[in-house]
From Swiss-Prot:
One of its GO terms (molecular function) is lipoprotein lipase activator activity. InterPro entries: Apo-CII, ApoC-II_dom_sf. Component of chylomicrons, very low-density lipoproteins (VLDL), low-density lipoproteins (LDL), and high-density lipoproteins (HDL) in plasma. Plays an important role in lipoprotein metabolism as an activator of lipoprotein lipase. Both proapolipoprotein C-II and apolipoprotein C-II can activate lipoprotein lipase. Proapolipoprotein C-II is synthesized as a sialic acid containing glycoprotein which is subsequently desialylated prior to its proteolytic processing. Residues 78-101 are annotated as: Lipoprotein lipase cofactor. It comes from Canis lupus familiaris (Dog). Disulfide bonds: none annotated. Its main location: secreted. It comes from the Eukaryota. It is found in: Secreted. This is Apolipoprotein C-II.
Amino acid sequence: MGTRYLLVLLLVLLVLGFEVQGAHESQQDETTSSALLTQMQESLYSYWGTARSAAEDLYKKAYPTTMDEKIRDIYSKSTAAVSTYAGIFTDQLLSMLKGDS
């Protein structure tokens, strides 16, 4: 869980760093700026694709598929128990309110 947040933070900082770099370089001449902007854009897309694929691989390795099955099993068992005990509680409450008729 913590590695995902760290990875997201790293990606955000990387994007912000490229924005700052791009803003600094945009103050140069227009002729060199357009070529440099294109190069930076291609570089950014390349880094973004690499980071995205690395993040997907990390997520697939860190999150086991059996976790979904365990969560579903726990949820179904707990809802069955809660509904059973809620039914018992309702019956007891109704019998207390009605009294012995």
